[in-house]
Amino acid sequence: MRYQGINEWLGGAKKLTTANGEIGAIYLSAAPPTDAARADAKAVDFTAGWPSAIVDCADATRAKQNYLWVGDNVVHIGAKHVPLLDLWGGTGDAWQQFVGYACPMLDLCRAWGLGYASASVTTGSLQGYQPSAFLDVEQQQFAKDNLNLYGDNCLDLATSSSAQRAFLEQCMGCALPEDCIFGWYVKMDWEGSAVADAYAAIRVQGFATVMAPWQSVGGAGYVYARVPQKGAWMGVNLLAYVHGTSGQPAYGIPMTLSGFTGNMGQVASKWLMLPLLMIVDPHVVQILAALGVKRGTKSDPRTTDVYADPKVPASRISGPMINGTVAPPATIPATIPVPLAPLGGAGGPGAQGFQVYPVFTWGLPEFMTDVTIEGTVTADSNGLHVVDDVRNYVWNGTALAAIEQVNAADGRVTLTDSERAQLASLTVRTASLRQQLSVGADPLSKTSIWRRAQKADYDLLSQQIIEADTVKNLPAVTFAQANKAAGGQSETLWHQMYRVNDIAGDQVTAIQITGTMATGIRWSATAGGLVVDADEQDAVIAISSGKPVKNSSDLPTADAVNYLFGITADDMPGIVSSQKEMNSEFEEGFLQKARLWNPRKLVENVQNAYFLMVYARDRKQFHSLVASSLAMAKLGVSTRACKESYGC
């Protein structure tokens, strides 16, 4: 039975009572809603065909303002029985089709955060969109303060009964509140309006999902995220429900393509679910810091942007807010080019907002299959070239054959049998390393193993191939990578990247990256321009207007951040708190020695401005995340916001 979990927890029919009174009786049925049930839903002003109420107070009027979806069950709220309609009004697993995995909202404690506006959204009124079932763990007043936002079914654990507490702890899989990792949310101040605070939600163990409650008050909006922990990695999906009334831009931040499926469609005529960002990294705190996240407190998480793990230094959780607008297309197609549209679009920035849509930047092994990367490089005497990083990929025969073909065309000697044998051994050891990384619970030990092995592997490859042959005009070399080849571990996620190194002045043209997400989305990108660090530890790939871009000269350390992003270290206290910390924390990496190309030129060339990916070698991928996150955000903000916030 699809809804066995919640039936077991709730015991069929269950009454939940808080200090504020009875929430309501809940009844579940596996049968699709009947015509009569749909008619009854209409009678209480629910929009047939869209998610409707689940758990709410006995007051049916309140229920109209608290939409939440669990499937196609029928839930009784007071005397009314209200159908829980599938996402598009069908009877199948619409949620699974929507996000690519089984519905995570089968039980009450997971049932907050996803709702849809009523038909009135077409007039710009969002009165129906207020997700319910916020489970408060702090104080009764906190719950009361959230009634308008989350409905009347806030559970006040401070004064709740032992039975209620036991129910929630069973549902959560951990004791409350001490043993739970609280959620994150990112508050974003949209241009032209203040933002209503969003609140940290209790995380549900094992689900790397994020829902985005969205409320519009004169253009205000917010995004909140739950960040669970699973093994050695933490994942964040930041989503935004973007909307726009006639003649107005929709609000959102164009970031990156996340792990969601196919055509996301329109929820209503003016609604669209847009995935913004996917991060999988053990240092999520520092990532969110780059996105403007600040530390919250257990006593009042509303005062700041994040309720953070207390073991994380507060100094690492602060940073600038990010502003932006985006005008979404009518639907997101199943095939998503990168980018979907140039910055500006018809009317230019400020007229319709920046039309920059999901851009894939990282996380290949987690979501991708049959990934290929093809590139054409003109190399100089330094001798490095578009080659696969065999520390991370299994070096395949296609790539070898292509290199040999180029070598032969240049009158060079192809790989010897000995070199082939050594390369084969390297492939085996790399695969073995992946297996090592897929077991065990200590991320530091994994990191240590990974870094030692990858360094040795890279040295071997460098000595035997790169230094022996200066490849010129490398044609369309294909690098294939099996999905989850590295076991899905974060330490390898960040290394499953296109490796370019030590180019120092080379030009790269026509980089083509294609792949299929595990959930079915096909994505691709074609553009030119390359920026890399001359140091082997780091590489930054910047996709410009499709024209070759030479590396800049070395930059003074103090100017590196400002040069790249148009902001200074003083603007990013959570990113770079001091020069001393930067030098030690980043191991003389990206911010010190990178040869950086100024992406402000991208903003100037708004019709063809792309920024694709950042690569980092070591476990402190923090600086890479900062680079890609801020660069993407910079390109996604409106002209006014850019000037006000970044001085561009």
From Swiss-Prot:
This protein's UniProt keywords: Host-virus interaction, Membrane, Viral attachment to host cell, Viral attachment to host cell pilus, Viral envelope protein, Virion, Virus entry into host cell
Membrane topology: Peripheral membrane protein
Subcellular location per the Swiss-Prot or TrEMBL entry: Virion membrane
Keyword Membrane: yes
A GO biological-process term: virion attachment to host cell pilus
Any single GO CC term annotated in Swiss-Prot or TrEMBL for this entry: viral envelope
Signal peptide location: none
Function: P3 protein is necessary for adsorption onto host cells. Attaches to a type IV pilus of the host.
Oligomeric and partner information: Interacts with P6.
Name of the molecule in the record: Spike protein P3
Organism: Pseudomonas phage phi6
